[in-house]
């Protein structure tokens, strides 16, 4: 073989290899992009407002931050955080086959600023997220439908999560570009403000990540300044033991006295740090029918709530996340609000609960009666 012939063959081989690699590249990435577009279209058809993608296998620091949070005892009585710490550390600790995360957002924005409702001290304040149907039930079926479609398209396994397993959804959402964790530690979106429910599908398929979102809080400290219990030791840090959402929902016993007056009329959750955020000016009200506020759960009268027995409680909060905490814990919260109402006409409502079978309710009733009697 002549040298010139050998060189020609090498050039031909190199050209063929280049064409093969180029063809493979253009086959893989357009297919991947087409697949992601199809998944987004399916998510939108199911009612999701946002659908973005993140790597589930890349390293991250969220697990380390959570460990510091738990080590400092800031998780309070949420012992499940400590027992599931290793599984929460990284998505692959939940499922070592996870390669991609499809992160879904569902807007639950209210149609008005809810904070002025706190001025009516004879009514209870229920967090915006809990005024409609339980979002777990609203989202989970749709996630399963979408996950089935993704599995069929990719031929790879999938797993579904909606705040019911030890998966850290907010860091994944930031990594996927849905928003960023604000100084109040909640997810914040430039298009939906503070009002997004999250769901995650983990897939064994490599779908390719979307760009992450940067933090856009700047010098604003509105969420930190408005907190009625100073639950933020520093920006981007939360001490759950001081948080009214934790106290009204997760904490089972009698509250420390220092927080009872601070709760005002908040009887389930607290929206102060969410609702005060300037980014909410870009948010729209939710159009999801099952998340619309029920009239009975917007500023309900404290006297009516204090009279609830277990059956009436279950009826009033049917399909609502409030039902999860049970009648006794809820009535405890109502009694703290009655004590803060300044309305002496509510004293009989509290007095009737001085003999309640539950000792925590009795303690709250005694506190409410004493507080109102001093006014």
Where are these regions (language model features)?
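Conserved hydrophobic register position within alpha-solenoid helical repeats
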Residues: 331-334, 365
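Short inter-helical turns and helix N-cap capping residues of alpha-solenoid HEAT/ARM repeat scaffolds
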Residues: 327, 357-358
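Amphipathic alpha-helical scaffolding segments comprising HEAT/armadillo-like alpha-solenoid repeats
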Residues: 313-316, 343-354, 375
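Iron-sulfur cluster-binding cysteine motifs and their immediate structural context
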Residues: 45-48, 222-246, 252, 266-268, ...
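Alpha-solenoid helical repeat architecture
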Residues: 323, 354-355
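Auxiliary alpha/beta "docking" domains used to position bulky ligands
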Residues: 28-216, 255
């Amino acid at each position: 073989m002549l040298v010139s012939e050998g060189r020609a063959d090498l050039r031909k081989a190199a050209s063929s290899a280049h064409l093969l690699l180029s063809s493979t590249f253009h086959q893989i990435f357009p297919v991947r992009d087409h697949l992601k577009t199809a998944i987004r279209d399916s998510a939108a058809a199911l009612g999701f407002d946002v659908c973005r993608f993140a790597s589930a296998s890349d390293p991250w620091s969220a697990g380390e931050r959570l460990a510091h949070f738990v080590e400092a005892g800031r998780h309070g009585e949420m012992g499940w955080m400590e027992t599931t710490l290793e599984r929460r550390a990284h998505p692959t600790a939940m499922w070592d086959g996870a390669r991609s995360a499809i992160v879904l957002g569902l807007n639950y924005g209210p149609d008005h600023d809810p904070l002025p409702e706190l001025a009516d001290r004879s009514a209870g304040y229920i967090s915006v997220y809990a005024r409609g149907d339980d979002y777990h039930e609203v989202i989970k079926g749709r996630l399963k439908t979408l996950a089935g479609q993704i599995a069929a398209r990719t031929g790879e396994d999938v797993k579904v999560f909606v705040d019911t397993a030890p998966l850290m959804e907010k860091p994944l959402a930031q990594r996927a570009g849905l928003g960023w964790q604000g100084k109040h530690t909640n997810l914040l979106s430039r298009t939906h403000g503070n009002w997004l429910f999250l769901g995650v599908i983990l897939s064994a398929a490599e779908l390719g990540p979307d760009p992450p979102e940067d933090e856009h809080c700047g010098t604003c400290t509105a969420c930190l300044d408005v907190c009625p219990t100073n639950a933020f030791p520093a920006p981007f840090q939360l001490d759950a033991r001081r948080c009214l959402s934790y106290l009204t929902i997760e904490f089972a016993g009698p509250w420390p006295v220092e927080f009872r007056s601070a709760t005002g009329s908040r009887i389930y959750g607290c929206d102060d740090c969410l609702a005060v955020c300037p980014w909410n000016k870009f948010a729209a009200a939710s159009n999801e029918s099952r998340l619309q506020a029920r009239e009975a759960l917007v500023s309900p009268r404290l006297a009516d709530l204090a009279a609830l027995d277990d059956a009436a409680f279950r009826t009033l909060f049917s399909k609502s996340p409030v039902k999860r905490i049970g009648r006794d814990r809820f009535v405890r919260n109502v009694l703290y609000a009655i004590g803060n109402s300044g309305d002496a006409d509510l004293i009989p409502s509290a007095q009737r609960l001085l003999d309640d079978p539950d000792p925590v309710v009795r303690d709250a009733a005694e506190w409410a009666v004493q507080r109102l009697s001093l006014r």
